[in-house]
Structures are given as C-alpha cells and as structure tokens.
Amino acid sequence: MQIVALTLVAFVAIAGASCPYAAPAPAYSAPAASSGYPAPPCPTNYLFSCQPNLAPAPCAQEAPAYGSAGAYTEQVPHYVGSPNREQLQQFHQRIGMAALMEELRGLGQGIQGQQY
C-alpha cells in the first residue's frame, strides 16, 4: 500500500513539475442560487480541449419491420431431431459414392502417370 501511495505521489509531483506555472485562481465568490459546483477554466495546453466539437450523426434509413426477429441480422441456427432410417441410408450412400469417386480418380491418375 505504501508503494502505491509513493508511486502516486511521484506521478503527481512529475505532472505538477511539467505543467507551466498558472496564475492563481481568483477568489471564490459564491453563486446566488445555483446547485452544483462551477466548472474549472479550460486549460489550453491539453491535447484535447474541454469543449468538444460535437455534431449529431445523420439518421440512417428506418429499418423494415422484422417481426419477432427484432434487429438481429444473423441467421438463427435451426436444429433438427435425429434422422430417420431413410435419411441415414441416403447419407451413407452419398459418402460411399464420394469415396468411390475419389478412389477411381486416384486410379486414373496412377494409370496416366505410368509409362509403357
């Protein structure tokens, strides 16, 4: 804890030493009936000034109604139940046919590469 406090004091001392001397603030005069605290004067030696130059962004075109989907643009994944017997047979046939085609392509390339 002491190291943190010591480091903080060192940073404050360095920051205070690097800032140019500013004239002391005028004596405080209490406002008549305002609530809150008055803002300090804006320094001129900061990279960003206190008064940002803000402008409202132009509005985009109004989005069409999406119903219950709201503003989501991603497709919601649709999970299905386990496949029936016919779907499994079709899947295995397709996998088998794809493997057979790859095997035949490999044989065709092997035959073409041989010299007689």
From Swiss-Prot:
It holds the Pfam family Vitelline_membr. Its main location: secreted. Expressed in stage 10 egg-chambers, localized in the outer eggshell (chorion membrane). Sulfated by pip; may be involved in embryo dorsal-ventral axis determination. Sulfation by pip may occur on covalently bound glycosaminoglycans. Residues 36-73 form the VM domain. GO terms for cellular component: egg chorion; extracellular space; vitelline envelope. InterPro entries: Vitelline_membr_Cys-rich-dom (IPR013135). The keyword Secreted applies. It comes from the Eukaryota. GO terms for molecular function: structural constituent of vitelline membrane. Keywords: Secreted, Signal, Sulfation. GO terms for biological process: vitelline membrane formation involved in chorion-containing eggshell formation. Residues 1-17 form the signal peptide. Disulfide bonds: none annotated. It is found in: Secreted. Belongs to the vitelline membrane family. Major early eggshell protein. This is Vitelline membrane protein Vm32E. It comes from Drosophila melanogaster (Fruit fly). The lineage of its organism: Eukaryota, Metazoa, Ecdysozoa, Arthropoda, Hexapoda.
